C-alpha cells in the first residue's frame, strides 16, 4: 500500500499483530537437513552424455553453482549403475563403469550431498510384454505411451515389489545416497487398467468410471479416490526407504500454482501429500509471456510452506519447455525474479538444466543459478529457521478448484485467487497463502484477516469456524460465490456464510453477468474514500445476485452502461440497488463481501481501480492502519519473516513487462513498518550497509536508497528473554 493510499483510507492504525507459522518438528537434528531451505542443482543427464563422461569436471561444475545437494541420474527408465534388478535397463554406454558410485564419492569429497533421481512412471516394451496388467489403459483397453515407453499405473506392482522397491533397496544398500528425487509421479491420465478396476470395485462396490464426467455425481468420489491412490503409492515408497535406512531425504515433483489443473490430472494433492515426503517440492514452469502471473513463484512458495509446515523446495524450470522451447532459457532477469520470490517467501530452490553444464546450448541462466543459490548460502543465518509473518491469510482451495471449477477450473476459480493475491502484493500487504485446511478455529486465530477469493466450496464446519472467527474479532474478505456450494460442488439454496457476509443469495435477481458495467459509489465509506474525482469504477464479469441483510451496507452498487452508441445520446451509468461491495461490522470483527468476481477482473484487466478497491477492503477489514506503508511502486513485492531478534523485510523488484528482460533499478524507497517493539539497528543485507531509521510508537521508518532485483532489510530488535 502506498503512502497516498494510507492517507486517503481514513482509517488509522494501532498495533499490528502478526501470524507465525511454526514448522512441524524441530530442526535441531542435523541429519534432517531438509528442514532448512535447501540449495539443489539438478543437471538432467542424458544417456548420450555418458560418452566420455568426466566425473571431476562434472563435480567442479556442480560446485560452482553454490549448491549443497546435486540431483544425480540413478535409475528407473535408465540405470546409471550396474543394476541387477530384472527389467532395469543398464545403459551400454557405461562400459562397465559404476557411474553412480563415482559421482557420489566425488560429490561427498567436495562437500555436497547426492540425491538419486529415479523415474518409475514409464517402462520398456519387454516389461509391457511380460506384465501388461501393470500399465495405464484407456477406456478402450489400449495402452498409453510416451514416445517409445509405456506409462505405468501407480496402483500396479511396478511401484512396489515388482520393480520400484527392489531398485530402491539396491541403491540404498549399495550406494551412500543422501536422498531420492522421484520424477513424474502420480497418474499420467485417467487409468482404466485391471488393477484400478479391482481396487475401485473393492473400495466402493461399483464399477470404475471410464472418465471424469462432472454431470455424474460419482466423479467427486473418483477424483478423491485417485488422489488417495497416489498418496498411498508415495507413502509406500517412503516407508520402503525408511525400512532400509533412516533419515534419507525423499521428495517428488508436484504442481505449482501456475498450473492449477496439473494436481488433479496427475492426482497429486499437495495437502494430501504433506506427510508423504520429507519436503514438498513444487514446480514453477511459467515460461509463457503472461504478465498476470508475475507473483506465482512467491505465491506457490508461501502456499507449499504453510501446507508442509517447513521450507518447501521450488523447482524452477530454467528453460521454456512448457512454451515449446526446451533448449532455450527463460530470460535471466525473469528467472532470477522467480527465484528471489521463492526465497523471499521461505523456500529453498532446485534449479534444473536439461543436460550437463558445458553441453547445453543455452547457458545464460547458469549465472542466475550461481547467484541465487549463493545468496541462500552466504546469508543462511537469515533464511534458516526464519518463519513467515503476516496479518493476512489468503486461502487457496483445491476442493473449489476441482469440484466447482470442474472443466473450466482456471477461469472459474484460479483466476480469482491470482487476481486477489496480485492485489495484495501490489498494495504491499504482507500475506501468507494457506489451504482450506487452515479454516479451523485454532489456525484462524493466527491471522487478523482471512481472504476467500471465490472459495465456492465451503463445508458447514468451515462456515462455523469462519463465523466464530469474525464474531471474535477477526476479519473476512470474500468474493463472488464464496460458500454458495458444499464440499462436493453442489449448489446450496443460500450462502453458508450469510451471517457474516451480511447478504442473502437472491437467485430471482436477473443480474448475473455484466459487460462494460460499473461499480458505482452509493454512500460514503472508508473503503471508497480514495475515490476522489470519480464515483464510478469500470467492471466486467460475473455478479452474484444477493440482497442486504441486517445492518450491512453497500458502498458500491452495480451500474449499467447505458447508451454507448453516440456521444450526443450517451447517458451516465444507471445506478441500481444491486449490491457489489457489502461491508458488515460486528462488536469487534468486520467483513467485506464483494458480490462479483472483481478479483478475476483485476487478474485479466490489470486496471488499477480494481486493485485499489480490493486493497482498501482488506485495510478497512483489518480495523486499523496498514502494517506497512511505502512509496514503492506496486510492482515491488514485500514479505516479512522473523527469527528473533531479527525481523526481515524482503523486497522483490518485478518492475517491467513480462517476460522480464532487465532489472529496473529503483531509488529512495521509504518504508513505515509497524513492528510493535523497540529497534536497535536497520541494515540492507545484500548491499551490506546500515540504514538510518526513526523508531516511535512501535513503528520504524527508514529509506532504502537503491533496489536492484532483490534486497532484505534486516531490523534488529532487543533480544527476547
Residue ranges and their predicted role:
Residues 65-98, 122-139, 189-200, 264-270, ...:
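Aromatic-lined carbohydrate-binding/catalytic grooves of carbohydrate-active enzymes
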Residues 49-62, 160-170, 263-270, 332-338:
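Short, acidic/polar
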Residues 5-26:
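N-terminal export signals
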Residues 40, 68-72, 99-144, 181, ...:
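Glycine-rich, aromatic-flanked loop segments that form ligand/cofactor-binding clefts
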Amino acid at each position: 500500500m502506498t503512502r497516498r493510499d494510507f492517507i486517503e483510507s481514513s482509517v488509522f492504525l494501532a498495533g499490528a499483530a502478526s501470524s507465525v507459522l511454526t514448522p512441524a518438528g524441530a530442526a535441531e537434528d542435523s541429519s534432517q537437513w531438509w528442514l532448512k531451505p535447501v540449495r539443489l542443482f539438478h543437471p538432467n543427464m542424458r544417456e548420450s552424455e555418458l560418452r566420455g563422461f568426466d566425473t571431476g569436471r562434472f563435480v567442479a561444475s556442480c560446485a560452482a553453482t553454490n549448491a549443497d545437494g546435486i540431483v544425480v541420474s540413478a535409475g528407473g527408465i535408465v540405470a546409471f549403475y550396474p543394476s541387477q534388478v530384472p527389467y532395469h535397463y543398464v545403459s551400454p554406454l557405461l562400459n562397465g563403469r559404476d557411474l553412480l558410485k563415482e559421482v557420489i564419492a566425488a560429490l561427498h569429497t567436495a562437500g555436497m550431498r547426492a540425491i538419486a533421481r529415479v523415474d518409475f512412471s514409464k517402462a520398456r516394451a519387454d516389461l509391457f510384454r511380460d506384465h501388461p496388467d501393470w500399465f495405464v489403459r484407456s477406456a478402450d483397453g489400449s495402452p498409453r505411451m510416451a514416445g517409445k515407453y509405456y506409462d505405468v499405473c501407480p496402483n500396479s506392482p511396478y511401484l512396489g515389489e515388482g520393480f520400484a522397491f527392489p531398485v530402491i533397496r539396491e541403491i540404498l544398500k549399495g550406494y551412500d545416497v543422501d536422498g531420492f528425487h522421484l520424477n513424474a509421479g502420480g497418474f499420467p491420465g485417467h487409468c482404466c487398467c485391471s488393477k484400478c478396476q479391482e481396487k475401485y470395485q473393492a473400495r466402493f462396490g461399483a464399477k470404475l468410471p471410464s472418465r471424469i464426467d462432472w454431470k455424474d455425481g460419482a466423479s467427486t468420489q473418483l477424483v478423491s479416490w485417485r488422489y488417495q491412490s497416489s498418496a498411498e503409492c508415495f507413502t509406500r515408497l517412503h516407508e520402503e526407504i525408511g525400512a532400509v535406512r533412516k533419515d534419507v531425504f525423499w521428495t517428488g515433483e508436484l504442481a505449482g500454482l501456475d498450473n492449477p489443473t496439473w494436481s488433479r490430472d496427475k492426482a497429486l494433492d499437495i495437502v494430501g501429500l504433506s506427510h508423504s515426503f520429507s519436503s514438498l517440492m513444487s514446480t514453477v514452469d511459467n515460461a509463457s509471456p503472461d504478465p498476470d502471473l508475475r507473483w506465482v513463484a512467491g505465491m506457490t512458495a508461501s502456499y507449499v510452506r504453510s501446507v508442509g509446515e517447513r521450507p518447501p523446495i521450488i523447482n524452477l524450470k530454467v528453460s521454456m519447455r512448457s512454451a515449446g522451447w526446451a533448449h532455450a532459457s527463460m530470460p535471466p532477469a525473469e528467472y532470477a525474479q522467480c527465484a528471489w520470490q521463492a526465497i523471499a517467501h521461505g523456500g529453498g530452490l532446485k534449479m534444473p538444466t536439461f543436460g550437463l553444464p558445458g553441453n547445453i546450448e543455452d547457458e545464460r541462466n547458469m549465472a542466475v543459478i550461481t547467484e541465487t543459490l549463493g545468496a541462500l548460502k552466504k546469508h543462511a543465518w537469515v533464511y534458516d529457521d526464519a518463519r513467515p509473518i503476516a496479518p493476512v491469510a489468503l486461502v487457496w482451495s483445491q476442493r473449489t478448484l476441482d469440484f466447482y471449477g470442474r472443466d473450466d477450473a482456471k477461469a472459474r476459480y484460479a483466476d480469482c485467487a491470482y487476481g486477489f493475491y496480485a492485489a495484495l502484493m501490489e498494495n504491499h500487504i504482507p500475506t501468507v497463502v494457506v489451504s482450506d485446511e487452515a479454516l479451523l478455529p485454532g489456525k484462524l486465530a493466527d491471522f487478523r484477516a482471512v481472504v476467500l477469493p471465490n472459495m465456492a466450496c465451503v463445508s458447514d464446519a468451515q462456515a462455523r469456524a469462519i463465523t466464530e472467527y469474525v464474531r471474535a474479532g477477526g476479519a473476512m474478505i470474500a468474493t463472488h460465490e464464496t460458500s454458495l456450494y458444499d464440499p462436493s460442488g453442489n449448489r446450496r439454496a443460500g450462502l453458508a456464510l450469510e451471517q457474516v457476509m451480511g447478504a442473502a443469495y437472491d437467485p430471482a435477481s436477473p443480474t448475473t453477468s455484466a459487460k462494460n458495467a460499473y461499480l458505482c459509489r452509493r454512500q460514503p465509506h472508508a473503503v471508497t474514500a480514495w475515490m476522489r474525482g470519480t464515483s464510478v469504477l469500470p467492471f466486467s464479469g460475473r455478479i452474484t445476485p444477493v440482497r442486504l441483510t441486517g445492518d450491512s451496507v453497500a458502498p458500491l452498487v452495480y451500474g449499467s452502461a447505458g447508451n454507448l452508441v453516440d456521444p450526443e445520446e450517451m447517458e451516465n451509468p444507471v445506478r441500481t440497488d444491486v449490491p457489489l461491495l457489502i461491508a458488515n461490522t460486528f462488536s469487534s470483527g468486520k467483513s467485506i463481501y464483494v458480490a462479483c468476481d472483481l478479483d478475476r477482473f483485476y487478474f485479466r484487466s490489470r486496471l488499477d481501480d480494481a486493485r485499489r478497491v480490493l486493497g482498501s477492503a482488506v485495510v478497512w477489514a483489518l480495523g486499523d492502519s496498514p502494517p506497512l506503508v511505502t512509496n514503492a511502486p506496486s510492482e515491488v513485492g514485500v514479505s516479512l519473516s522473523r527469527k528473533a531478534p531479527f525481523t526481515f523485510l524482503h523486497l522483490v523488484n518485478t518492475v517491467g513487462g513480462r517476460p522480464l528482460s532487465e532489472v529496473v533499478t529503483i531509488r529512495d524507497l521509504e518504508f513505515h513498518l509497524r513492528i510493535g517493539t523497540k529497534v536497535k539497528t536497520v541494515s540492507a543485507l545484500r548491499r551490506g550497509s546500515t540504514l538510518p531509521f526513526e523508531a516511535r510508537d512501535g513503528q520504524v521508518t527508514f529509506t532504502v536508497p537503491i533496489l536492484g532485483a532483490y534486497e532484505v532489510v534486516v531490523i534488529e530488535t532487543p533480544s527476547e528473554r
